[in-house]
Amino acid sequence: MAELTTIARPYAKAAFDFAIENNAVDSWAEMLNFAALVSENESMKPLLTGGLASGKLAALFISVCGEQVNTQGQNLIKVMAENGRLEVLAAVSELFTGYRNEWAKEVEASVVSAIELSSEQQQQVSVSLEKRLARKVKLNCSTDTTLIAGMIIRAGDLVIDGSVSGQLARLSDKLQS
């Protein structure tokens, strides 16, 4: 994974810089996300790693993407195809999203709770995280009944485990040591 990120970073950075210059960050994020989904498609994967000529591969990929990818996005796809790097398009999209979130002072937070959170509870969690992180927070909420009660919050490098199962695991570790 680290190798894919290393390969994808210059493409993501170049695309992000271009998007900033042209005031098109959101449209580029959508375009790269769509292209990444195409590259991850099971019928497309063998073509990306096969021996297809770069020009034909780029033309095929662009035709599959259709109007979802603009001229500049097509140019990125052509350059990546010429360099044999289309298989890292998902990593490019992921890095681009990270650059966009950093630029917009946003962070995506994953909240896993034992029961479904009400919209009021989600709002409280969001406000608390925004204060703590000094960023706008976008919550992705899910449920996991194995937590027993409480929640686990992941936002970037921050992990807050307030679940009962987590507390029991920590207590068990302390008792065993």
UniProtKB/Swiss-Prot annotation:
Protein's job: F(1)F(0) ATP synthase produces ATP from ADP in the presence of a proton or sodium gradient. F-type ATPases consist of two structural domains, F(1) containing the extramembraneous catalytic core and F(0) containing the membrane proton channel, linked together by a central stalk and a peripheral stalk. During catalysis, ATP synthesis in the catalytic domain of F(1) is coupled via a rotary mechanism of the central stalk subunits to proton translocation. This protein is part of the stalk that links CF(0) to CF(1). It either transmits conformational changes from CF(0) to CF(1) or is implicated in proton conduction.
Family matches, as NCBIfam families: ATP_synt_delta (TIGR01145), PRK05758.2-2 (NF004402), PRK05758.2-5 (NF004404)
Gene Ontology cellular-component annotations: plasma membrane; proton-transporting ATP synthase complex
Membrane topology according to the record: Peripheral membrane protein
Homology family: Belongs to the ATPase delta chain family.
Keyword Amino-acid biosynthesis assigned: no
Pfam family, one: OSCP
GO molecular function, one term: proton-transporting ATP synthase activity, rotational mechanism
InterPro entries: ATP_synth_OSCP/delta_N_sf, ATPase_OSCP/d_CS, ATPase_OSCP/dsu
Quaternary assembly: F-type ATPases have 2 components, F(1) - the catalytic core - and F(0) - the membrane proton channel. F(1) has five subunits: alpha(3), beta(3), gamma(1), delta(1), epsilon(1). F(0) has three main subunits: a(1), b(2) and c(10-14). The alpha and beta chains form an alternating ring which encloses part of the gamma chain. F(1) is attached to F(0) by a central stalk formed by the gamma and epsilon chains, while a peripheral stalk is formed by the delta and b chains.
tRNA-binding is among the record's keywords: no
UniProt protein name: ATP synthase subunit delta
Keywords from the UniProt entry: ATP synthesis, Cell inner membrane, Cell membrane, CF(1), Hydrogen ion transport, Ion transport, Membrane, Transport
Cell compartments where the protein resides: Cell inner membrane
